[in-house]
């Protein structure tokens, strides 16, 4: 008999593919996001982008900047600004911890992926990151190529 398939832990709606290449991720944290209904529908359809977006702390709240959400095509209400600031939902202790870490030189908050959890709620995975230098990026490419060659050799034997 086959096992009953359960719901997956989460379904990735969108991901920031360049984030792990351009930044060294030191820590990750999960945050909720405050959206309107039509924006959630657009994200479910995959019409959103996290590239070139970042999070910042302003007056004790975390805001996600430059996240592109294309307006829902069947929306009858006023259309919203596609790249408006969106509030992220975190506990105050988490915000204070992030604030202290960001005050260090060279650290920033970037969204790594957006996904729907088991309950169907949209979550954003934020990464506390430090920008990579050009030689670090080259090293990442070399390591990736070496792993790929090893996999190809393993397939042959």
From Swiss-Prot:
GO biological process: trans-translation
Disulfide feature: none
GO MF annotation: an example: RNA binding
A GO CC annotation given for this chain: cytosol
Function in brief: Required for rescue of stalled ribosomes mediated by trans-translation. Binds to transfer-messenger RNA (tmRNA), required for stable association of tmRNA with ribosomes. tmRNA and SmpB together mimic tRNA shape, replacing the anticodon stem-loop with SmpB. tmRNA is encoded by the ssrA gene; the 2 termini fold to resemble tRNA(Ala) and it encodes a 'tag peptide', a short internal open reading frame. During trans-translation Ala-aminoacylated tmRNA acts like a tRNA, entering the A-site of stalled ribosomes, displacing the stalled mRNA.
Keyword RNA-binding tagged: yes
Segments traversing the membrane: none
Keyword set includes RNA-binding: yes
Source species: Chlorobaculum tepidum (strain ATCC 49652 / DSM 12025 / NBRC 103806 / TLS)
UniProt-annotated location(s): Cytoplasm
Signal peptide residues on this chain, from the entry's feature table: none
InterPro entries: SmpB, SsrA-bd_prot, SsrA-bd_prot_CS
Protein name: SsrA-binding protein
Family, per entry: Belongs to the SmpB family.
PANTHER family (UniProt xref): SSRA-BINDING PROTEIN (PTHR30308:SF2), TMRNA-BINDING COMPONENT OF TRANS-TRANSLATION TAGGING COMPLEX (PTHR30308)
Keywords: Cytoplasm, RNA-binding
Gene3D superfamilies: 2.40.280.10
CDD domains: SmpB
């Amino acid at each position: 008999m086959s096992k009953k398939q359960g719901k997956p832990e989460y379904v990735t709606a969108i991901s920031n593919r360049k984030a792990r290449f351009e930044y060294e991720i030191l820590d990750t944290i999960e945050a909720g996001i405050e959206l309107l209904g039509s924006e959630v529908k657009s994200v479910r359809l995959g019409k959103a982008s996290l590239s070139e977006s970042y999070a910042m702390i302003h007056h004790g709240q975390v805001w996600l900047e430059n996240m592109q959400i294309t307006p829902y095509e069947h929306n009858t209400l006023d259309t919203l600004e596609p790249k408006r600031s969106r509030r992220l939902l975190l506990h105050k202790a988490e915000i204070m911890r992030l604030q202290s870490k960001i005050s260090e030189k060279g650290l920033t908050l970037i969204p790594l992926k957006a996904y729907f959890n088991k309950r169907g709620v949209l979550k954003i995975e934020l990464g506390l990151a430090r920008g990579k230098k050009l030689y670090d990026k080259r090293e990442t490419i070399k390591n990736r190529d070496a792993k790929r060659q090893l996999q190809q050799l393993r397939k042959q034997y």
